[in-house]
Amino acid sequence: MPSTLQVLAKKVLALGEHKENEHISREYYYHILKCCGLWWHEAPIILCFDGSEQMMIKTPIFEEGILLNTALMKAVQENNYELINLFTEWGANINYGLISINTEHARDLCRKLGAKEMLERNEVIQIVFKTLDDITSSNIILCHELFTNNPLLENVNMGEMRMIIHWRMKNLTNLLLNNDSISEILTKFWYGIAVKYNLKDAIQYFYQRFMDFNEWRVTCALSFNNVNDLHKMYITEKVHMNNDEMMNLACSIQDRNLSTIYYCFLLGANINQAMLTSVLNYNIFNLFFCIDLGADAFEEGKTLAKQKGYNEIVEILSLDIIYSPNTDFSSKIEPEHISSLLKNFYPKNLFAFDRCNPGLYYS
């Protein structure tokens, strides 16, 4: 086992990329890194820290950086024994390596470095959960490569898996879990996270490999207010839903989906049906935005709200005399214009309601 001094020296070298050095060329510096085993995928390994002071590994492939434990899992999957040792020396949890073992040699090395015999089912879930903390394209792609077809995920508790999925996917969880295989569920899960957080490199990665999931991509763009990705899919004719189906998703999954609601409205979707969908899903901000766009299905909305026991919405819709369409909107459908128009937007009719009923709805 290398001495503590050797481990420290390698850390200092890996951190050296971020410091100016007039005495050696970049080529010679990279040569030193390669000789010291600080080399991965034909490129130097650079060590850095995130805002929480967690150690991260950067390479040209992982240019956004990946957490040390994630790097260990990838090194184990690749049977890169030198890096398994290196990342463990730097403090990676060797038990994380158990999730991606695919050879007996790698298993023996992990045991030698202190790993337990096997992971419990709840430990597998915890590793997935913690790895998901890092929302970048590099990390979401790695999640797919490490976990999607991993046999350890075949036997996890689906109740615990549902909790992880719901944490990120919210009301899309049931739709996602309707898929037959855990592999398909996980692939769509990572893809959905990429769309939700507009991780462009990850979106492109999944798009190139899973053309059959275009409708899922559109569903996520609508549900998570990603008007840029929605527009990209629409203008390239990758959307195979009608405008009202799209509006239904935009209004139902989460509140404050203003950009995608507005986009569907400009395409010609029925704004009264959008209003009723917002009532049904108790999305009050969406409801007021629909009224701003000209929705006037107040009686139908009240009937639906009474059936659901939504007393606050009944109160909102009973004051229809104070509401009127907002005339400040335009017909420009470009995402940049929509984002600019709706930045810090507050529905005119919600403001009118607030003045009549201060404190009833906390926006």
UniProtKB/Swiss-Prot annotation:
Entry superkingdom: Viruses
Keywords: ANK repeat, Early protein
Expression induction: Expressed in the early phase of the viral replicative cycle.
ANK repeats: 66-98
Keyword Transferase attached: no
One of the GO biological process terms: taxis
Function: Plays a role in virus cell tropism, and may be required for efficient virus replication in macrophages.
Protein name stated in the entry: Protein MGF 360-19R
Organism: African swine fever virus (strain Badajoz 1971 Vero-adapted)
